[in-house]
Design a protein with these regions (language model features):
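Conserved cytosolic headpiece of P-type ATPases
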Residues: 1-739, 746-747, 760, 800, ...
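Transmembrane alpha-helix/helix-exit interface in multi-pass inner-membrane proteins
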Residues: 267, 763-775
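Helix-coil boundary and interhelical linker segments in multi-pass alpha-helical membrane proteins
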Residues: 698-706, 772-794
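ATP/pyrophosphate-binding catalytic subdomain of soluble kinases
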Residues: 762, 766, 805-808
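Membrane-water interface at loop-to-transmembrane-helix junctions
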Residues: 742-761, 789-798
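A C-terminal functional module that forms or caps the active site or interfaces directly
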Residues: 814
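Generic alpha-helical transmembrane segments
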Residues: 717, 794-811
Length: 893
């Protein structure tokens, strides 16, 4: 079969078995999809489960646990007491940890795939004669698709129709200059049998981007049967970048590991000196005991569940955000959202409802001609079934305006024969249509100040007369009066031809026009936005409006929303052009409204705000918004009106295009970061307490905890409440605080001090419990006996129960780092459930005879011991209340 670009469009349609005006039927498309498969590039083969499982074993913590198991086994054999209970428990923990790691990876992948599906690219496809929006993955060869500026080309296609459509193909050809497409057959050059990809001007390829105009094309290749597929072969598996927080935690783990090694070496040396170097070298049991102390300390120091818990909390937060219509595309955005200080928001569709309605006219031409001209100079279409227009909201308003007057069959009666599509530089568009009497009429629609400037004549009823300066001033005043009412105003002008213009470029069409009139329409403010902006203000987040609208319209809406109080706080794109970057940087905070801006201005605005050390979020929907969105700290794409290009560079996509969703996402970002800090503080304070306890006990000369007991606390007692803390609701004042400084580390705000102090408090309670247990058992406390290894089992059990119960009580303290536990109004059901689970498991391991002997040896704790352990553990609540009160006073000062 001849290549598509060497064949006429009609031949290609015939080969694909499709009617250009009807597209494929849904049944035929389903049949073809079953044969060709989804329109996706192949992904790299996923790592098998068994390999993932063993990859988990390479974790330094897991290696340390395996070493502990080996040393424990050797110690038992050397002593002639081969009891492999400790070994079994440690290996069980290793296996469970690895299985959980694999499961978490799989869940993360599933969550990512689900989020990618939510933000999957959509295509405008003709099916059964109707234009529908479908996921690009469902395209099949033969589908007729519509393309317009901002769309990513979803498959390899043969162009059927092009209205000055230009496509950027740098991803394929390396050529950054957009290529103008046409539907004509490509002729082979003499002596050649093919055409270079970059010269195939009647083709558009997957991965390229429409940057100007619009067109229609038929799909000829999907998935791996595309030029992109040939180049890709198979996509390399993309690695998810670590977030700044995860990087900090990895660094924390490295620091802890170094500290552990240093402390272990010190303890190992102290123990050898105490036992005597000669004795240790001749007594393998003493050497192995010393090793076990060092391993215990290592197990105590490293919070095994921290990274997993933080990852799960982040993942749960992303899922929760998605339910609130904020789709996070980059995990680092979750953290940055909590620091956001300035939001640069589009007006249309984000602050407003994007449901434009024409409410006022300023007519020069007859009303029917004016309404028809506005509708014809639009790409929105009248849908008979819906009884309203479908398409871009502003153009829908114009087509609906004509529809109300009974003018609904205009495009069939007046076919379009030429056009100069809209672009933000010209601020207008022009079309040439055939009239009923065989002539041709040009309609130009756009910004009133631009269109009025191009007019030399004006309608007066049915007559055309010269446009005087006096009349021009009246039109400018009428435009301003409508804009002052917060109306979006568009002007219409016309021009008549006896034949189709040979040149339909903007320069050829847009001059010497006849003014027809003005349309004033309103896009109502979203009802929830004013409250959201007020909430943002309370949270130290400033909202500024960026719009292409007239400055008067923009200011009127900004006043309504509380963004500005008067016109002096607004600036236009033209004003920006007259300012140097230095001037803009110095005065950027003086303005809350940027009107009549073009996409290139947005990048300057972002840069200026960032020069003031602000964390900036920027919203956008058009292809030209991509640079400013990428430059912002948080790029926000629009899920409904946004182009594929914009969504692809955004950190977050708003599924509902709603400003209030951004504020909700900022709150969620603060909540997640707050909770992660609570989790870190909770886990590290426990680990520090374990380290201090083991370290002090070792220095004195007795053993307080075995590795298996510390593992129980770290992986069972601590992890469940830590996860529940990650699901804690936002504190009541979370949106009353200023944004946190993005440069602050995890331990900012005295958190390092909190961890150390709380670790010391827990250490005192645990050691006190140990000595009380020894006293209950022996009736006195004698250090020499304890060093000799006598009668410490009851003390160990009491210390273990106290450590577990302290953690269970302490997790409730950690619902807030500063607020009193007794002022928390909302309940965290997950925390109660996790605390109950940890309590039940602790009771089982201390009461069930087999497990108790495995963990503690042949010892039974009397009721007074249990009550004493509980009493000491409960002290963590009043002690923390005192500490919080002190810190509140210190931080207030």
């Amino acid at each position: 079969m001849q290549k598509e670009y060497l064949s006429a469009a009609a031949e290609v349609l015939s080969d694909q078995g499709v009617d250009e005006n009807l597209g494929l039927s849904n049944d035929e498309a389903s049949s073809r999809l079953a044969k060709t498969g989804p329109n996706k590039l192949e992904e790299a083969e996923k790592t098998p489960l068994w390999k993932r499982f063993f990859e988990q074993m390479a974790d330094p913590m897991v290696i340390m646990l395996i070493v502990a198991a080996v040393i424990s086994a050797l110690t038992g054999m050397v002593k002639g007491e081969p009891d492999f209970a400790d070994v079994a428990i440690i290996m069980f923990v290793v296996i469970v940890n690895s299985v959980l790691g694999v499961v978490q990876e799989a869940k993360s992948e599933e969550a990512l795939e689900a989020l990618q599906e939510m933000s999957a690219a959509q295509s405008k496809v003709l099916r059964d004669g109707k234009l529908v929006h479908l996921p690009s993955a469902e395209l099949v060869p033969g589908d007729v698709i519509m393309l317009e500026a901002g769309d990513s080309v979803p498959a390899d296609c043969r162009v059927l129709e092009s209205a000055t459509m230009k496509i950027e193909e740098a991803a394929l050809t390396g050529e950054s200059v957009p290529v103008e497409k046409h539907a004509n057959v490509i002729e082979l050059a003499a002596g050649t049998d093919d055409v270079p990809l970059g010269d195939r001007k009647n083709m558009c390829y997957m991965g390229s981007t429409v940057v100007y105009g619009r067109g229609r094309a038929v799909v000829v290749g999907t998935g791996m049967n595309t030029e992109m597929g040939k180049i890709a072969g198979a996509l390399a598996e993309a690695k998810e970048e670590l977030t700044p927080l995860q990087v900090k935690l990895a660094e924390l783990s490295r620091i802890l590991t170094i500290m552990v090694i240093v402390i272990c070496v010190v303890i190992f040396g102290v123990d050898i000196i105490r036992h005597g170097v000669g004795n240790v070298l001749t007594d393998p049991t003493a050497l192995l005991d010393t090793f076990m102390v060092a391993v215990s300390l290592a197990v105590a120091a490293i919070p095994e569940g921290l990274v997993a818990v933080v990852t799960i909390v982040l993942s749960l937060g992303v899922t929760k955000m998605a339910k609130r219509q904020a789709i996070i595309r980059k995990l680092s955005a979750v953290e940055t959202l909590g620091c956001t200080q300035t939001i640069c928001s589009d007006k249309t569709g984000t602050l407003t409802q994007n449901k434009m309605t024409v409410v006022k006219h300023e007519l020069a031409a007859p009303k029917e001609k004016f309404l028809a001209g506005m509708a014809l100079c639009s790409d929105a279409q009248w849908d008979e079934e819906l009884g309203e227009a479908v398409g871009e909201p502003t153009e829908c308003a114009l087509v609906n305006d004509a529809g109300k007057a009974g003018l609904t069959g205009l495009t069939a009666e007046h076919p379009r024969v030429g056009e100069a599509p809209f672009d933000s530089g010209r601020k207008m568009m022009s079309v040439v249509v055939e009239t009923l009497d065989g002539e041709y009429e040009q309609y130009t629609k756009g910004a009133p100040d631009v269109v009025i400037g191009l007019c030399t004549h004006i309608y007066e009823g049915d007559k055309v007369v010269p446009l005087t300066e006096e009349r021009r001033a009246e039109l400018v005043a009428a435009n301003k009066a409508m804009a002052d009412e917060a109306l979006r105003v568009l002007a219409l002008a016309s021009r008549t031809y006896t034949e189709v213009p040979a040149d339909c470029s903007p320069a050829a069409l847009e001059h010497d026009l006849v003014f027809c009139g003005l349309s004033g329409m309103i896009d109502p403010v979203r009802p929830e936005v004013a409250d959201a902006i007020h909430e943002a203000h309370d949270a130290g987040i400033r909202t500024v409006m960026i719009t292409g609208d007239h400055i008067d319209t923009a200011v009127a809406i900004a006043k309504q929303l509380g963004i500005v109080t008067d016109r002096s706080q607004a600036i236009t794109g033209a004003d920006l052009d007259r300012m140097s970057d230095e001037e803009l940087d110095a005065h950027i905070e003086d303005y809350g409204v940027y009107a009549r801006v073009q996409p290139e201005h947005k990048t300057r605005i972002v840069e200026a705000w960032k020069s003031r050390d602000q964390i900036v979020a920027m919203t956008g929907d058009g292809v030209n918004d991509a640079p400013s969105i990428k430059r912002a700290d948080i790029g926000v794409g629009m899920g409904i009106t946004g182009t594929d290009v914009t969504k692809n560079v955004a950190d977050m996509v708003l599924a509902d295009d709603n400003f209030a969703t951004i504020i909700g996402a900022c709150e969620e970002g603060r909540r997640i970061y707050d909770n992660i800090r609570k989790v870190i503080q909770f886990l590290l304070s426990a680990n520090l307490a374990e380290v201090f306890s083991v370290f002090i006990a070792t220095l004195i000369g007795f053993t307080i905890f075995q590795p298996v007991q510390l593992l129980w606390v770290n992986l069972v007692t601590d992890c469940f409440p830590a996860l529940a803390l990650g699901m804690e609701d936002a504190e009541g004042d979370i949106m009353k605080r200023k944004p946190r400084n993005a440069k602050d580390g995890v331990f900012a705000g005295h958190m390092g001090l909190d961890c150390v102090v709380q670790g010391l408090i827990i250490t005192v309670l645990v050691l006190a419990s140990f000595f009380v247990g020894v006293y209950f058992d022996m009736g006195y406390i004698h250090i020499a006996d304890m060093i000799a290894g006598n009668a410490d089992e009851e003390g160990v059990m009491m210390a273990f129960i106290t450590l577990n119960m302290v953690e269970i009580f302490h997790c409730f303290n950690m619902r807030s780092r500063r607020a009193s536990l007794f002022t928390m109004k909302k309940q965290n059901k997950w925390l109660w459930a996790s605390a109950a689970l940890a309590l039940v498991l602790t009771v089982i391991v201390t009461v069930q005879p087999t497990l108790a002997e495995m963990f503690f040896g042949p010892v039974t704790l009397e009721l007074k011991g249990v009550l004493a352990a509980l009493g000491l553990a409960f002290l963590i609540i009043p002690l923390m209340e005192i500490y919080k009160a002190i810190m509140r006073a210190v931080e207030k000062e």
